Amino acid sequence: MRIVARRVEGYAHDVEIEGGHRLRADEPGTIGGTDTGPSPTRLLGASLASCIAITVEMYAERKGWELGPVEVDVEVGYEGPVPTDFEVGLKLPAELDDEQRRRLLVIATKCPVHKVLAGEAHVKVVERLEAA
């Protein structure tokens, strides 16, 4: 998968994601951005919330469990500008039994974004030279 971020103005960047998707990332005006899109750290929280929701829904579907809409909320705690804590709330239907609930809470920790945040990925920054 390839993702490319290109500066628009100030800190605003248009992001192209393989598959034809586009979005804008920016910083709030309070730190010099123009607030034309969510900040990268807010996008990280959004990625976690949506990844958990999709993972839980896919698992329940494979098991034949009727979930209806799942709601996931993420509270992000910071140390300075760095997000250090993610508290995830998973709202499940009251009709599920205790074992189903327990299983879905475990499955929520198996989503790819959760795994990355838990330190299971490697990030390497390399310089790419422009062609002359």
Residue ranges and their predicted role:
Residues M1-A46, I54-A132:
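Extended beta-strand/beta-hairpin segments
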